[in-house]
Amino acid sequence: MSSSSADVLKISILGNESIHVGFHLLPYIFKTITTTLPSSTYVLITDTNLSAIYLNDFKASFEEAASEADNKARFLVYEVAPGEGAKSRKVKGEIEDWMLDNKCTRDTVILAFGGGVIGDLTGFVAATFMRGVKFVQIPTTLLAMVDSSVGGKTAIDTPHGKNLIGAFWQPSYIFVDLAFLTTLPTREVSNGMAEVIKTAAIWKDDDFALLESRSAEISLAASSRPTGVPTAGRFVSDRSHAQSLLLQVVSGSIYVKAHIVTIDERETGLRNLVNFGHTIGHAIEAVLTPAMLHGECVSVGIVLEAEVARQLGILSQVAVGRLTRCLQAYGLPVSLSDRRITALPASSQLSVDRLLDIMKIDKKNSGPAKKIVLLSRIGKTYEEKASVVADDVISKVLCEAVTVKAATPTKSPITMATPGSKSISNRALVLAALGKGTCRVRNLLHSDDTAVMMNALVELKGAVFSWEDGGDTIVVEGGGGILSTPAKGKELYLGNAGTASRFLTTVCAMVSGSASSERSTVITGNARMKQRPIGPLVDALTANGAKVKYLESTGCLPLDIDTDGFRGGHIQLAASVSSQYVSSILLCAPYAAEQVTLELTGGQVISQPYIDMTIAMMKQFGATVERQKDEQGNLLDIYVIPKCTYVNPPEYSVESDASSATYPLAIAAITGTTCTISNIGSSSLQGDARFAKEILEPMGCIVEQTLTSTKVTGPPVGTLRALGNVDMEPMTDAFLTASVLAAVAVKPCLPERKVEGLPETASRIYGIANQRVKECNRIQAMRDQLAKFGIETDEFDDGIIIFGKPEASLFRGASIHCYDDHRVAMAFAVLSCIIDETIIEEKRCVEKTWPNFWDDLQNKIGVAVEGVELETHNQASTSAKPVSPIDQSQSDRPIFLIGMRGAGKTYVGRMAADILSGQFTDADDVFAQESHQTVSEFVAANGWDEFRKKETEILSKFVEEHRGNHVIALGGGIVETETARETLKAHVAKGGHVVHVTRALEDIEAYLDSIGNTAVRPNWGETFADVFKRREPWYQACSSHEFYNVLEAVGGQTHEEHTKAMRAECGRFFKFITGRESNRPRLSVGNPTSFLSLTFPDVTPALIHLDELTEGADAVEFRVDLLSTTGQAPTRPALPPISFVAKQLASLRLATTLPIVFSVRSKDQGGMVPSDNAEAYGALVRLGLRCACEYVDLEVCWPEQLLDSIVQLKRETHIIASWHDWTGDMAWDGEEMKAKHVLCEKYGDVAKIVGTAKSGLDNAKLAIFVGEVQSHPGAKPLLAINMGAAGQLSRILNPILTPVTHDALPSRAAPGQLTAREILQARALTGSLPAKKFVLFGSPIAHSVSPLLHNAGFATLGLPHTYRLHESEKVDQGVLEVIRSPDFGGASVTIPLKLDIIPHLDSVSEDAKIIGAVNTVIPRGGKLHGENTDWQAIHQAAAQNLDADALSYGSSTALVIGAGGTCRAAIYAMHKLRFKTIYLFNRTPENAAKVKASFPESYNIAVVTSLSSLPEAPVVVVSTVPGNSLTLDTFSQGIYLPSEVLSRPKGVAIDLAYKPHMTALLHAAEKKEGWKVVPGVEILCLQGFKQFEEWTGKRAPQKKMRKAVLDKYFA
């Protein structure tokens, strides 16, 4: 057989069989081309990556074919750089010029060999060269094979968007050689599979069924090279079954595309169908490219657009579930919460508004209406075109949260069925898989839980699943109990599916060793699953001979389960925690080696109805379980299960889920409407079917229940009866539904249910202790979330008490945190039906049991649901209107502090809690309260192991809290147990914060020696150093961040200055990690920024000079690679010790509040860290993330695996992804530079590219490059400069974080680096920084020092601005001319114009509105904005000077003296400091009363008529009266200031009077030990610094500005 022969499948398009599909086709391709497309010149266009692999084979195949055809044609090759950048006008023109240079004529045949980029580019060249020449597509990626190569679309990209310039130009042939796929990364194959799945979904349901049922074989054929014959698959005779499957699905996809193109070549209607998933997918891709591939984005789009169709009532949930599982089977993401997406910096830009905005320009749209291809079932679309869909429908699908619009259900009376029971579905899957024969299961729940169960059973080779009736029926071919282990290295991942984990534990124990290649199976799950108990089941199995190992925490997943471990015989099992343990053994018992007798121990058996359900179902599959009785005929908890093999019934119908039915029934109860559940009645196997009769009927509902249906009619709204005492043990999952009803049940409970000692309107639910170990601690969750409505609750050992309140008195606008728990979300949806504006934060958690719950709520029940986009990823779950007493913080998880005894956890924790307006708790104190012993006493009596157990139990309770400003210091040894470590790791994995507080070992030892032994701290029994060494790796592994506690003063600081600096850094750190304040400058072209590059080997000697060094800089670059413990600059690549780096960074933090750029520069990139040690580089970079640096530099030269791992840990830190070319070989107009930029944008929030200028021309090329890449929508900030003297102009023109130096630094970090002052002066000279004029308005102002203050700042930084006085008693024409002048830079405003200026401004800050005065005018984008910096100055003066011990503002008071205009700023500042009471004194009380009346009551202002009788001594005293108004002399005419006012041991006195420098108040306070004084001139400076920074965007050079003022002041 000739080597140029092959068995190909030919597909017709536009009347020609021009698509040829097969394997190993190169010889066939060139034989076909040379014989059917004769030419004088064949031009191959490919990229450099592919040419390196295939070019020799191409040339050989061409030469052989040409020789056989006696063809003397030329074979020319043109290579382009790989990547999307090649699809440009520039590259197209270069190809055309090259072809013309090579004398190519109209008979030229162009061959496009590559992916979509090459195909699109080459096709457009062919369409336009010589007005059109023939071309051939030879696609190499699966995406190109099934999509871009078929249909004749060709195009290039422009700065305005992708594919905007092109033509329809059909190729002469499309050769699809599937053998090329075996050289692709698995991710690229999956990328193409998204399009294959999409096509099957819209057109070919049989291909879709093949794709979902044979995914493993299809994936194997696409990714594995054949063994033996290298060309296996070229002919049918040597083609494997897997290859045939791959060929079938790929050719089927191509056929659909070809058929549609044939009917609608120019995309006028039908061809739009192939864009299913693309409307939303393209929008996602526009934000995430290039980090996420096209197919990955389309995969998410497919699921979301399917959900749109489901929401519209067009598509069933079964179809959505099938699509989701099929895409997942090929490794594709299916939601925006996929870890691969959330780990990307760009994911923060995936707002609903942004995506909808991008969708506006979709080519399918007609005008403003958005069009989406809607499925009606698998294999068929709703219309033969894209359908118009409203924005609110799309928005609801995209939003992560929903709000239920409180109203009476419009569809009442309602008759509906709920999804299949999760409990029955999971049992049916196990029974049918273990049984013999085929079973058709109907009404199976299609959810996350059942999906993982099915996937696991397939991995165990226990069953084959397929679908009928459009997916409504699942066909199970049982394996008869023959199971084998998954493939090597494959774990069974179960997510948070508790039922599946428990059932599969026993299933895995019965796996046959003889049928397996591996000795054991590992089952695992997500972080929460690893906390849920499974110990009693494992104990029972191991006692029975099974070998089960805990791989992490004892008592929880993951488990390693050996084969052949289910011996049988007599098994004892503790069943007081979960009935699922019992069901697990029951279901598998018939296959044990011996007949099983199962004895339940441990007291009352939980959820007996579910055990009865399991036994009843086993009987339907042929196994009859006998429950034994005692001599009196009473049932015992002993079950005998015969050995047998299940026989599958031909059909099995899953009963609807009774737990899910409680929600629509409860909605009827709470809204006074009627609902009938058509397929659950009194004959149900499920315990929750009793909910209507036993819960709703006693609450006042009319309940009508038959064997198969349940009808509920609720009483009038607001008349539900309380439950009183009720046992919900038979239906524990339904307690959440009962709880939300009890919250608004205000009529007295039935007399027989009354609980002594509780009100008649209380509901006491018991028998639900197991609900603490479900998806979350549901009892605690219910209490925390009900509190947001103002509902009071209590709990006891196995239940909860709810005190009902009228719904009218409840808080509106609560934002409900769902804990990823479906039942929490659906329960609060019930309450939301009468409490408006309630937000359910995690709408998707309902997918566990009722994926289309929100759609059914609107479409079937008639309660409107709207999408809600939360403000941030850690949006508050505690917001409510009116403001409730619950914490209003941004993050909803507590902050844990860990670290060695003596590291400073209490010191840091107290400051952190105060800064976050929260609570501090020492876990050891909680332990002492609960155990009534100190830790030392407890350890002495019970030992360390028992203490660690109790300590971990306390930790577990804290973890369940949802108060983001609760700071908890844990004991130093919390990391000693695996369980506690895993709990902390899980907390971090969920986005929680665990901060390792640390100090140098010797510092901690010295501190502990200084305080000696204490009664509350037990001895370790080993040396401190040994304990430190053992725990340090655990602290690192369990924490998200690290806070290095520097207790000694740095940079010449006094003790007082050090204390202030520590508080400032503590505030920055904790506000930063919790997302409250980023401490980063605004990066934009209009706001040029720079950072100072520190080049010291040891920064500590320079800290005293840091204020001067950082003048004009917006950040400080901490060059880690230049550090050295010797204090000498490193001369060869070396790694500074991490502990040394951490301390250096912490010391630097105490000397500056500027953001830090944490840079670890490798040798090849111009630094001193070795370039061959990725692990060490990664460790140093991760330290920057752990220490909460605002920016971390990440070199993109390192392996992608390292880069990906670092980006996933970034949290609030912004990554500066960098590339430095020290050779000068990379040209700014070259493709390599574009490729580096793409890489930097992929990994960074900021891209940094540094070239080397050889001439001034390189700066011009750089400017062109920046202009091109920054013109793309969504482009990230770009720092692009040239090194060398010739590149200095690029530094002057660069607006984003320009690296700068200072004359006092030991060296410049890079050649050509300039100082900040030099850059600003150069910008002024070149006109890029125009001179602005600043003024002070008011009268009298002749003696004002404001011009000195601001002009000193301008001069220090090299700014060309000026500040002058403009005296005026009113806002006259002269004032208006100044503020409307084009060179107006800003204004200070003093009396009498602070109020008069407001009508002439475009906007005023909320602060200034409340105060009623503007003292600063700021031009912003052609508009004038008013601000008040007076209150900011007062606030700063108080906060910085208050002693840390006096910082419990919430329980302290402040005093403001005076009722003039400035007092309002002082009151506002004290309110912002959270003082519980603000005393206001004025000599004329009536004026003080007027001031009080103008502020909200929440400010708690108390007018006092005498300073001698204050109810409580204040912590802060602010005087706003003239300097001589107060007196210490009782006989003086002024206001007498009694000493009692300053009787607090510590405090701050602030006098706003400009002169005298030391007023009576300040003199008195100065004599009081512990009191700090702030004179008026300091307030003037502080408010001026704020103004300077608002106007210039630069940090004020405070020392020099203050000096200029004080020199004049004291002159």
Curated annotation (Swiss-Prot):
PROSITE patterns: EPSP_SYNTHASE_1, EPSP_SYNTHASE_2, SHIKIMATE_KINASE
Pfam family for this entry, one: DHQ_synthase
EC number: 4.2.3.4, 2.5.1.19, 2.7.1.71, 4.2.1.10
Reactions it catalyzes: 7-phospho-2-dehydro-3-deoxy-D-arabino-heptonate = 3-dehydroquinate + phosphate; 3-dehydroquinate = 3-dehydroshikimate + H2O; shikimate + NADP(+) = 3-dehydroshikimate + NADPH + H(+); shikimate + ATP = 3-phosphoshikimate + ADP + H(+)
Sequence positions that bind Zn(2+): 195, 278, 294
Main location per the UniProt record: cytoplasm
Annotated region (3-dehydroquinase), positions in chain: 1094-1318
Region (EPSP synthase): 404-863
Keywords: Amino-acid biosynthesis, Aromatic amino acid biosynthesis, ATP-binding, Cytoplasm, Kinase, Lyase, Metal-binding, Multifunctional enzyme, NADP, Nucleotide-binding, Oxidoreductase, Transferase, Zinc
Domain of life: Eukaryota
CDD domains the UniProt entry points to: DHQase_I, DHQS, EPSP_synthase, NAD_bind_Shikimate_DH, SK
Residues given in the record as NAD(+) binding sites: 47-49, 84-87, 115-117, 120, 140-141, 162, 180-183, 191
Pathway annotation: Metabolic intermediate biosynthesis; chorismate biosynthesis; chorismate from D-erythrose 4-phosphate and phosphoenolpyruvate: step 2/7; Metabolic intermediate biosynthesis; chorismate biosynthesis; chorismate from D-erythrose 4-phosphate and phosphoenolpyruvate: step 3/7; Metabolic intermediate biosynthesis; chorismate biosynthesis; chorismate from D-erythrose 4-phosphate and phosphoenolpyruvate: step 4/7; Metabolic intermediate biosynthesis; chorismate biosynthesis; chorismate from D-erythrose 4-phosphate and phosphoenolpyruvate: step 5/7
GO molecular-function terms, A-Z: 3-dehydroquinate dehydratase activity; 3-dehydroquinate synthase activity; 3-phosphoshikimate 1-carboxyvinyltransferase activity; ATP binding; metal ion binding; shikimate 3-dehydrogenase (NADP+) activity; shikimate kinase activity
Region described as Shikimate dehydrogenase: spans on this chain: 1331-1611
Chain positions covered by the region annotation 3-dehydroquinate synthase: 1-391
Protein's cellular compartments: Cytoplasm
Span list, region Shikimate kinase: 892-1093
NCBIfam families recorded: aroA, aroB, aroD, Shik-DH-AROM
Protein name: Pentafunctional AROM polypeptide
